[in-house]
Amino acid sequence: MAKTAKGIRPGELNLKEKLVHINRTAKVVKGGKRFGFNAIVVVGDKEGHVGYGLGKANEVQDAIAKGVEDGKKNVVKVPIIKGTIPHQIVAKYGSAKVLMKPATPGTGLIAGGAVRAVLEMAGVRDVLTKSLGSSNPHNVVKAAILGLKSISDANDVAERRSKSLKEVFES
């Protein structure tokens, strides 16, 4: 199977899917209304890989299947340390803003709606989140994924700065 942009092979991962939202659309034609559906699906292995997809079709099941296929093409790696994220993130997509804060073990996944689905599929167990601005599930999911993409763990920071881990934590 082909690699995604980050070199992740979705075929080698044990991806599960979670349906976030289904929307029914209508097209008015001469004989009445034609209904279509679109589905937002989040896929992940609950071990640090997560992606989202949008599927559109005339039937709900077909839309979900297309969403899953699209989600497998957009899988990203999320650094998870002791069940939480390494640092606080504020991510924005459109007018949707998502704030994610690391939490101590035992706190649980405190998130609502679309953000919860993304974090569950990523495998994050302890995190505090707040969704601000738009509650449109399309934009909230995209903001959450953008935030998770932007996380950098200490090894990445040390490599970018050409320093050791000890030097990074001292500065």
Swiss-Prot record:
> According to its record, what are the GO cellular component terms?
small ribosomal subunit
For this chain, the family text in UniProt reads: Belongs to the universal ribosomal protein uS5 family.
Question: This chain belongs to which protein, by name?
Answer: Small ribosomal subunit protein uS5
Task: For this UniProt record, give its keywords in alphabetical order, as a comma-separated list.
Answer: Ribonucleoprotein, Ribosomal protein, RNA-binding, rRNA-binding
Q: Could you tell me which residue ranges the S5 DRBM domain spans?
A: 15-78
Q: How does it assemble?
A: Part of the 30S ribosomal subunit. Contacts proteins S4 and S8.
What gene is it encoded by?
Answer: rpsE
Q: One biological process GO term for this chain?
A: translation
Q: Which NCBIfam families match?
A: rpsE_bact
Q: What is known of its domains?
A: The N-terminal domain interacts with the head of the 30S subunit; the C-terminal domain interacts with the body and contacts protein S4. The interaction surface between S4 and S5 is involved in control of translational fidelity.
Instruction: State any single GO MF term.
Output: structural constituent of ribosome
Q: Which organism is it from?
A: Chlorobium luteolum (strain DSM 273 / BCRC 81028 / 2530)
Q: Tell me which InterPro entries the record gives.
A: Ribosomal_Su5_D2-typ_SF, Ribosomal_uS5, Ribosomal_uS5_bac-type, Ribosomal_uS5_C, Ribosomal_uS5_N, Ribosomal_uS5_N_CS, Ribsml_uS5_D2-typ_fold_subgr
What is the role of the protein in this entry?
With S4 and S12 plays an important role in translational accuracy. Located at the back of the 30S subunit body where it stabilizes the conformation of the head with respect to the body.
Top-rank taxon: Bacteria
Carries keyword Ribonucleoprotein?
yes
Kindly give the Pfam families that the UniProt entry links to this protein. Ribosomal_S5, Ribosomal_S5_C
